[in-house]
Every structure is written in structure tokens, then in C-alpha cells.
Amino acid sequence: MLLLELKKTNQTLETIHFIGIGGVGMSGIAEILYNLGYKVQGSDLVENYNTKRLESYGIKIFLGHAEQNITNVSYVVISSAINPKNPEIKEALERKIPIIRRADMLAELMRLKCSVAVSGSHGKTTTTSLVACLFEAAGLCPTVINGGIINNKSTNAYLGSSNYLIAEADESDATFIHIPSTIAIITNIDPEHLDYYRDFETLIGAFRSFITNLPFYGFAVCCIDHKIVRKLVDDITERKIVTYGIDSEDAHIIAFNINTDIASSTFDVKISLPNVLGTTIIEKITIPTPGRHNILNSLAAIAVGIELDFGIKAIKNGFNNFKGVKRRFTKVAEYNNASIIDDYAHHPEEIKATLATAKNIANKQNGKVIAIFQPHRYSRMQYLFDDFMLCFADADILYITDIYAAGENPIEGITGRSLVDKITKRKHHDKANFLAELDDAVGVIIDNAASGDMIIMMGAGNISSFANELEGRLSSRGFSCHTVV
């Protein structure tokens, strides 16, 4: 980065090209580099929210991948999601243009900063956003690179003026262990990305390295309600670790007196830090998002704020300023006095957390939970098939579509219909249905929605676009639907 800075100063700007620039991780880094003054461009297969946003800043976006897209570039940035046979990669190799992995570019941005890296199987994006809100409330102005759109900012990345950088650290391909972080957060560890790691123990080992690679003056923040994380923490003695939880009485930071509704969660916090005498109680902390899992995410942010002496007022103000993250239990519409929720949940543990939150709210409203789930990736379904069969218990009515491939080839016997058949055969759910076409979900909503119901549309594929288009789809059939802005 220092060499690039020198070239920038000397007015000899070189172009950095991002393949797959519309991806949430890639778009964030591209935006930060652009705001730092670098010349940035990129390509993606289709236009989306991220490409439109970047284009509005003046960043050149190519739709489609082609050799000519990198005619005048000096560096190419890729993520692990990019196929090695991509024509732009092949052209870069042919012309010996340096190809930089997304994680390596993120590491360069973090290298000269005091950095907070947030990792874990679930909750990374929300936790990153919450930490950022506390930094801002404390009078610091961090640079933030997130894995989702932060509603406060309408972007997933923004440049700050301080020496702090807060980033979501993607564990999918083990590159997160090379990120030069000062503070590391681990929200949880579940079997995920086993197509890369091959076995769970290797994945756990990567998280261990994530902690032990911290400098001696840094610290980790870990959720020990999760048994795998607890075991990991118990085995590490060479780094400072601050723990948090709801059920773990020995955690350093514990939430209690919990109340939650459709829009928020309120709780008290007990703080008993290592090597600090006495206990501190913070009463009535409120976060404007529901769910036990989000309370845990907020505890991670509190741990960072307490360790960095932000003060209780800044912590409370930071949470008050938090407006949520796009696609994390986002209410997008109302139909027949039922709430329609768009959620990114695509792993069994995420699904359980989302449906548990919905069930809690529906019970208070004398309603039911209607879950419409679009599976994501054949490989994930194959590795976690048994877990998927068991994760829908809190749905009163369940509909499962076919699998959103995300570029993968089909795997024999692994389909949305086969999942429904197994759930029904083994009596894990008595109202599980296969939805042949996502468009059929409109009829499901018309036929089933009643006052107080929670309609949860989940998945990492195109179900989000569908959920956000429901007003038009329902009105075209003569039904009134109120979109929530």
C-alpha cells in the first residue's frame, strides 16, 4: 500500500480491477480504495444494489466478464467465489498482471490501523455494525468494511478519519487467519464451509490461529455459550480473552432480565472482567432489533467498548443509533395484518435463531409462524442435510423451495423436494410442503396469512428480491399489501 501511496502522490495512478465487484465483500473494499483516492473499476455478471451504488460514485462497472475489461489495469482483485476459468483471470495470468486475493487486499488496508476483526459462523455482519456504532458514539470515526448493508449508512463500507478499522473477517477459505487484527471477535463456530476445510477440526484450528495470531497487546472476545468456542477458549492461554454469554455464569459479560418484541430487545448486563475487582451492572440496554442471537451480538460489542473504556453512556448511545442491517430480520411488508420478514438465514443454526425470534413475537400476537425457505448451494445441503431436517421446529407452517445453486452443479438426491420428503417421513414437521416455484409463495401468503402472523422468507439466494417485490405481486392479483420503508 505504501508503494501505491507513493504512485498516487506522484500522479501516476494505476487501475485496480475487481472481478465480482458486486459481491458484498468485494464492493466494500472497492469503495474504501476509491474513497482513499485510488482508481478503481470492476466487473460482475449482473447489476445489483452494490454495483449501482459504486457506479453512482463514478466507479466504472462492466456487466459481464471479458478479456477486454482489464485492458489498462495494473492489479486484479478476486475472491474465492471467482472461478479460476474466468476470462479476466486467464487474461491477467497471460499478461502477468498481479492477482490479489480479497483477503490480502483487506489485510493491506488493516495493516497500519488498529483493527477489530469480527468472525464466526453466524452474526458477523450485525456484530460488525454494532461495534462500529459504539466506536462512533465514543467519538471515534472508524473505517468500516462489512458483509452487509448497514442501514444507518446505506452502504457496507465507509471511510473514517481515525486510526481504527472494523472489518468482517470471512472464515470461508481460511484467509481470515492472515488478517493483522488487534482485536478478534468470535461469535460462534459451526460446521460450515466444509467443502473447503473438509472436516470440522480443521475449521476449529483456523479459529484457534485467528486468536493466537493476535499481537501480545491485543485481545479476543468470544461467546462461550457456544460449546465449541468454550472449548477453544479453555485451550488457549497465550492471549487475553474476554468472554460473553447469556447462559454461561462464568462469562465476563452476561446479559439478563431480557425482554424482546418485534422491533427491539432490552436487557441488563453484568460485567466481571479478569484482573478487575468487583462487578459492574449496566441496566436497561436497548438494541432496536429482536432476538436472543442479537443480544449475544451486542454483548460482543459491549466487551470491546468496556475494554477500550468507551463508557456506559457511549455504549447506550451507540446502540440507540443502530438501525439494523439489511436482510437481518428485516420487515419488508404487511399483508392482512401479518408481518413479512426478509432474512439471510441459510444455515441450520441461523434458521433456528430466526424462527425462535419469530415464534416469540408471534406468540405475543396470537399469531403463527409461516416459514418459506430457499436452500442455498447443493454442497451445503449435502453436508448439513440432517441438521436441515431438524431446524424448522418453530415454524407452524413450512414451505421449502428447490435449491438456489449459486453456480454449483446439482448433486444427485440433494434437492428441496428430497428435504421435504425426509422431514415428513421422519415426522420432524407435520406441515412441511415443497414449493415448486418461488412465485407460488404469493399464493401461500394469500391462503395462510392472518393477523399477528410472522411470514419469514429465508435464504441467501434470490428470495430476498422476491420478498421485496411482494407488494407488486400481490396487487397484480387484486390484493392489497403495505410495503414497509
From Swiss-Prot:
UniProt keyword terms in alphabetical order: ATP-binding, Cell cycle, Cell division, Cell shape, Cell wall biogenesis/degradation, Cytoplasm, Ligase, Nucleotide-binding, Peptidoglycan synthesis
Location in the cell: Cytoplasm
GO cellular component annotations of the record: cytoplasm
Domain of life (superkingdom): Bacteria
Annotated GO biological process: cell division; cell wall organization; peptidoglycan biosynthetic process; regulation of cell shape
GO MF assignments: ATP binding; UDP-N-acetylmuramate-L-alanine ligase activity
Catalytic activity: UDP-N-acetyl-alpha-D-muramate + L-alanine + ATP = UDP-N-acetyl-alpha-D-muramoyl-L-alanine + ADP + phosphate + H(+)
EC id: 6.3.2.8
UniProt keyword 4Fe-4S, yes or no: no
Pathway(s) annotated for this protein in UniProt: Cell wall biogenesis; peptidoglycan biosynthesis
InterPro entries reported in the protein's UniProt record: Mur-like_cat_sf (IPR036565), Mur_ligase_C (IPR004101), Mur_ligase_C_dom_sf (IPR036615), Mur_ligase_cen (IPR013221), Mur_ligase_N (IPR000713), MurCDEF_pg_biosynth (IPR050061), UDP-N-AcMur_Ala_ligase_MurC (IPR005758)
Residues binding ATP, per UniProt: 120-126
Pfam families: Mur_ligase, Mur_ligase_C, Mur_ligase_M
PANTHER family associated with the record: UDP-N-ACETYLMURAMATE--L-ALANINE LIGASE (PTHR43445:SF3), UDP-N-ACETYLMURAMATE--L-ALANINE LIGASE-RELATED (PTHR43445)
Record's function text: Cell wall formation.
Family classification: Belongs to the MurCDEF family.
Name listed for the protein in its UniProt record: UDP-N-acetylmuramate--L-alanine ligase
